[in-house]
Amino acid sequence: MALTAGQAACVNTLDAPLAVSAGAGSGKTYTLTRRIVHALESGFIDDIGQVLAITFTSKAAGEIKSRVKGALRAGGMTEQALKVDDAWVSTIHGMCSRILRAHALELGIDPAFTVADEATVKTLL
């Protein structure tokens, strides 16, 4: 799949954070995947652990991880591919939960907490 000019700018702009906003089916997942892989292949970053990618859905985060893992394997970057499942690619809720769990004892919260869904919140209120 060839990149559009806008997608290519996203992939090749590695020295600044980006927000990618576009409609369904426009190639956001593909573009973010290519950007992450390009950052590793070019040596801009040394490890997939240096990536933070926030998506709106867990499904999209899973798809990005799957595609990045496949591209890294195909490019001979097996060690990095093995680390993708632990990469910081998630929803904003997933990222915040991960940070809270990592510091749960310091914060005085149960590290096995769950995030309340909308129905639970309504019940509690």
Regions found by a protein language model. Name each.
Residues 1-110, 115, 119:
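P-loop NTPase Walker
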